[in-house]
């Protein structure tokens, strides 16, 4: 089991925050602004909203990825990922 942490600057351009992997990943998110998460085509219309200060733990199945986009400007998203080998 490997754990990594990062601070991602989320902008109005969607970006990958948990890459495709060959194992299940547990991803802990702490948003510091309005962040929308979802698949590779995530938008502010289709994503799941994390408001400023929200925290979420999500399981990403093998072969899937998680992406994020901001509603406006840019802000930080703290990410802690644990890979289950």
Task: Name the predicted role of every residue range.
Residues 4, 73-76:
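Short loop/turn segments at connectors of secondary-structure elements within structured domains
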Residues 1-23:
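Surface-exposed ligand/attachment interfaces on beta-rich extracellular proteins
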Residues 30-48, 80:
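Short, surface-exposed beta-strand/strand-loop-strand elements in extracellular ectodomains
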Residues 24-27, 60-74:
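Noncatalytic modules at the cell exterior or secretory-pathway interfaces
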Residues 51-63:
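Beta-sandwich interaction modules
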Residues 76-83:
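Edge beta-strands of extracellular beta-sandwich domains
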Residues 2-4, 68, 83-84:
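Viral virion structural and adsorption modules
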